[in-house]
Every structure is written in C-alpha cells, then in structure tokens.
Amino acid sequence: MKKTIVFKCGGSVIRELSEEFYQNLKELRASGWKLAIVHGGGPEITNMLKRLNIKTEFSGGQRKTTKPVLEVAEMVLSGSVNKFFVAELAKHGLRAAGISGKDGGLLEADYLDPETYGEVGEIKKVDASMVNALMENGIIPVIAPLSMTSDCKTLNVNADLAASAVAGALEADKLMFVTDVDGIMKEKQRLDVLTPKEIQMLIKQEVITGGMIPKVNSALSALSDQVSEVMIVNGKGSFFAEQTFQGTKIVKAKEAVS
C-alpha cells in the first residue's frame, strides 16, 4: 500500500523553498509516496489588504475576517499563492492541481465565533475523496485553506488546522510542518524525536521560545488517533536524504528499547 504525507507550508516560507525541497518531493514520489500540500498565505494577504487600503484587525492571534477581508483572502489563497506553488512544482517536473477546501466538498465548517473572528470557520467534516483521486493519479493536490458551510457560505480556516484535518481524513503516515529551521534545537543540536510531555518541558525551560512555540503547538494539536507522527522540517534545505527524513519527529510516545 502506498504511503501518504501531508505537508503544511506557511505563507512566509512558500517563496523561499529550496531546490533541495523540490528535489526531495521528486524523490518521495519516485519512492512511491503519495503527497498532498496545504498552504497558508498570511503575509501576502496582509500586503494585498494594505494595497487595497482595507483595514484589518487581529483577535487572539487570528485575523478578524470581515467580508471584504474574506474576498481578498480567497483571491490571494486560491489565486496568486496557490497557482505560484503549482507552477513551481511543475517547473520541477511534479504534476500538481491547485484546489481549495471548497472544491469537492473537501472541508465543511461552521462559524467559529462570528462576533470575534468574523468569517472564520471551524472544520466539522472532511471529504477527502477528491484529494485521494488526484493522488491516485500521480497528481499532488495543493490545497488553499478555505471551506464552506453546509449552506455553501465561504469561510476562511486556519491552515494548520486544515492540514491536520486533511491528514486525519487521509490517515496519513506523516504530517510535516515545513518551516525555515531544521527542527527543534537545543544547544545548537537538533532534537530528533520528542513527545508532547518533553515539548512542554522544553517550553518551560525556554529552550523552545518565540516563533517556534506556535509551530510546535500546531504540531502537538495535529497528533491524533489518525495522525501518529508529525514532523517539523526545513523547507530551505534538504529534509530527505538516503531514504531518511531529517527534522524533529513528534510522537505520542517513544518506542520502548528492548
């Protein structure tokens, strides 16, 4: 049976992905892995909102998505960012199809909290049949994090949560958060395998600080019955060499050494 990896690429890293990253994807495809990508686009949405002079505000770290903001978010996520990614994959000999969570009923959501967050959804249902069909035909689905309600209203969704939901529905072997660092570091050495308990300890000890904390928390929340392994890898270098993944692996529990 073919194995599956879902990648989550943040908006800040998409245009910085290295040649090695794309070569690694080719190697994985050649080795029989099925691949899907979920991407963000926060910085580009912010830039477009500024250009169009549309005011935006944040609440609890999440952008308040008014209807004008949602229009811009959909334009950027499903448009410029998604198609840039598809073109980059094509340049490297990888067939890809750009879709959003609205396509094929992939992500169904309800309003998270309209008062606080506006047009932002909480994912309630995932239908991964379209994603599976693309992957079975050797095509990498590139998914923008938009969703629809049961009565077909468009809602923005958090890209990390979208990636987790897609990985869960696909029963993916791995969910990889693609960042600009080699993984979780301690004293300039990468920590190869961590459990949630160890991560909480490292946050307490201030080994994990700053911008790494939300990345790690997203990885932790992605661990579930369906997704047993999450990795933090570097998209600016190589994350796969000699059939081995390089990064920090986060698992529910470490295997006992016999």
UniProtKB/Swiss-Prot annotation:
Q: Does the keyword Kinase apply?
A: yes
Q: Which GO terms describe its cellular component?
A: cytoplasm
Catalytic function, reaction form: N-acetyl-L-glutamate + ATP = N-acetyl-L-glutamyl 5-phosphate + ADP
Arranged from A to Z, the UniProt key words for this protein are: Amino-acid biosynthesis, Arginine biosynthesis, ATP-binding, Cytoplasm, Kinase, Nucleotide-binding, Transferase
List locations, semicolon-separated. Answer: Cytoplasm
Principal cellular location given in the protein's record:
cytoplasm
Listed binding positions for substrate are: 41-42, 63, 156
Look up keyword Transferase and say if it applies. Answer: yes
Looking up InterPro entries in the UniProt record yields:
AceGlu_kinase-like_sf, AcgluKinase_fam, ArgB, Asp/Glu/Uridylate_kinase, Glu/AcGlu_kinase
Its Enzyme Commission number(s) read 2.7.2.8
For this protein, the record's Pfam families field holds: AA_kinase
Q: Name one GO molecular function term.
A: acetylglutamate kinase activity
Which pathway does the record list? Amino-acid biosynthesis; L-arginine biosynthesis; N(2)-acetyl-L-ornithine from L-glutamate: step 2/4
Site entry: Transition state stabilizer: 8, 215
Per the record, the similarity remark reads:
Belongs to the acetylglutamate kinase family. ArgB subfamily.
Q: What is this protein called?
A: Acetylglutamate kinase
Q: Which gene encodes it?
A: argB
